[in-house]
């Protein structure tokens, strides 16, 4: 059983609600639809509910609009609505989304309520059989299950859950909204659930997109030292059961990594890529964003995957270093040879 302690002076998570009239004014947009419709969160086109607001920043995503259940959709000014949904027309939907992400970010002060004499927020749920070592900080709304070991100077942030039998070594961080399964091992200096790399460009620079999703990690997962795994922007980042990561692996926001995958040191997977089971990646290899990778793919060391993979197999793309012009010619020649 989890031990529930009392909490003092906790504000909790904000649950702000706005009318579409408010939203349109905030993002300097034109509202088409019901000005009194209320929304309380952001959501993707595929998963948004009636109390969510979503956005479309590219024509390639407009095909999702017809099935979208969002309370309103932010679109470009030249968009021509063909139904009775609520729309907000703006110059730049992505930048408008960035503005709203800050409004709907629920975390005000993740360190509030922590007593510096023991570093555990009095509302945190900590099982009696777990061990928490000196300097570790446990935020409010965090839950630590049975037989967990949390090393020195670990931070477990708001809405984080640590499963039974999991070990988190010194100086690691579960930033926020991280669910860590049973019997996991987190080696030193890992950062789980950090902000993804999301910024909306404008003429004046970049506007930060607040990351509102979670990081969901399965059972029997091991993270080598110095791994960095971002939580989702709107939807969740998901790491499957039995995954093993070597040192200094980076996985970006919204990635889905299938069960029993193994990734060697200093690999990186860019945002919103979906990967099946049993992936193996050799050291210093990478996968760019928004791809689909099937089950049972092996990627050789130093290989960069730039297209989706639908056929299981061993994929290698290593070339000796050359001057750029020579490299470009060699690449074209190799592609022609492989098609013969």
PLM ranges: what are they?
Residues 1-117, 122, 129, 178, ...:
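Terminal amphipathic alpha-helical/low-complexity segments used for targeting or macromolecular assembly
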Residues 55, 114-323:
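Structural signal for interior beta-strand "rungs" in well-ordered beta-sheet cores
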């Amino acid at each position: 059983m989890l031990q529930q302690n009392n909490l003092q002076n906790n504000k909790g998570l904000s649950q702000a609600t706005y009318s579409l009239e408010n939203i349109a004014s905030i993002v300097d947009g034109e509202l088409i639809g019901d000005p009194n419709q209320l929304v309380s969160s952001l959501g993707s086109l595929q998963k948004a509910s009636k109390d969510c607001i979503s956005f479309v920043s590219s024509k390639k995503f407009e095909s999702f609009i017809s099935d979208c259940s969002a309370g309103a959709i932010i679109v470009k000014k030249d968009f021509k609505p063909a139904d009775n949904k609520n729309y907000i027309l703006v110059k730049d939907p992505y930048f408008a989304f960035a503005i709203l992400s800050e409004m709907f970010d629920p975390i005000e002060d993740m360190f509030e309520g922590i007593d510096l004499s023991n570093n555990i927020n009095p509302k945190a749920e900590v099982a009696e059989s777990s061990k928490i070592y000196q300097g570790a900080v446990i935020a409010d709304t965090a839950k630590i299950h049975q037989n967990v070991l949390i090393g020195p100077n670990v931070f477990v942030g708001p809405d984080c859950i640590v499963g039974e039998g999991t070990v988190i070594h010194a100086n690691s961080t579960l930033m926020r909204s991280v669910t860590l399964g049973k019997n996991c091992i987190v080696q030193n200096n890992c950062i789980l659930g950090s902000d993804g790399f999301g910024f909306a460009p404008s003429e004046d620079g970049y506007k930060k997109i607040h990351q509102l999703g979670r990081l969901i990690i399965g059972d029997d997962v091991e993270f080598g030292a110095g791994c960095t795994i971002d939580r989702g922007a709107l939807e969740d980042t998901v790491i499957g059961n039995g995954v093993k990561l070597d040192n200094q692996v980076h996985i970006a926001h919204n990635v889905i990594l299938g069960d029993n995958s193994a990734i060697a040191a200093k690999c990186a997977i860019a945002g919103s890529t979906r990967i099946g089971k049993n992936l193996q990646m050799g050291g210093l290899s990478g996968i760019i964003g928004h791809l689909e990778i099937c089950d049972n793919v092996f990627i050789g060391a130093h290989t960069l995957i730039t297209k989706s993979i639908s056929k299981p197999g061993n994929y290698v793309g290593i070339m000796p270093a050359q001057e750029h012009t020579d490299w470009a010619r060699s690449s074209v020649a190799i592609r022609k040879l492989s098609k013969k």
